[in-house]
Amino acid sequence: MRHAMVGTIAALAILAATAGSLAATPSSPLAAILADPGRPEADRARDADRKPAELIAFAKLRRGASVAELAPGGGYFTRLLSAFVGPKGHIYAVAARPSPALTEIAGSHPNVSIVAGKPGEIPVPAPVDMVWTTLNYHDFKNSKQGDTDAAALFNQAAFKALKPGGIYLIVDHQAAPGAGASVTSTLHRIESVVVKREVESAGFRLDGESDLLRHAADDHSLGVVETGIRGKTDQFILRFRKPR
């Protein structure tokens, strides 16, 4: 019995090591998804920095859920979210100009659809369980429709798109204390206090925040793509909930 237990523990340890850092979320679906040899090597190389298993767990994403992913870029999270929610769930990739990689993902994953609208729109066909965006909110501040920036429009659209009790997850690069939203177009950072204030003003309540992607060595003075800091920026994670 003892030998069987030791063998089981060893197997689980190997699986966890293969899948990346899963200490916070030892669930087998996430481990299997991350360990999938079919994932692009470039995606697998980013797992250690992005900690997707822990992030998905913090987001409280459920199997079978519907998700609107804002500005998904090359689809790193799109692939993972699609695999995690499974065939009973759906990912709506909100992208006005989808990348070739995102177009390929939508073509090969039946539960992924690309939906396009004006900046600040989330044109989903039915209310969703979650709105998800990573490293984009600061860029939304740099685009306007009339006198209103796209961040405010997306916050309003997220509130409208979500089911009562739905989650709005935002991850972004932290700016220096006092910077507010003044460096969104230069350093591509924003202070989390600004995001909290703006999202709560759209009707959401803060449901949780995580230090999972904090990096104390980042002094917030460099642009996020500069050599030595790219992939190692100090990032905040905010989980908001639409009241029921």
Task: Describe these PLM feature segments.
Residues 82-83, 148-164:
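A short glycine-rich, Lys/Arg-flanked "PGG" loop and its adjoining helix->strand segment in the class I
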Residues 219-244:
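Core SAM-dependent methyltransferase catalytic element
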Residues 7-17:
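Bacterial N-terminal signal peptides
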Residues 68-122:
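Class I SAM-dependent methyltransferase SAM/SAH-binding core
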Residues 64, 87-88, 162-168:
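Short glycine-dipeptide loop
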Residues 109, 122-135:
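A short acidic, Gly/Pro-enriched loop at the edge of an enzyme's catalytic core
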Residues 180-207:
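Conserved Class I S-adenosyl-L-methionine
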Residues 47-66:
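Conserved alpha-helix/loop element of class I SAM-dependent methyltransferases that forms part
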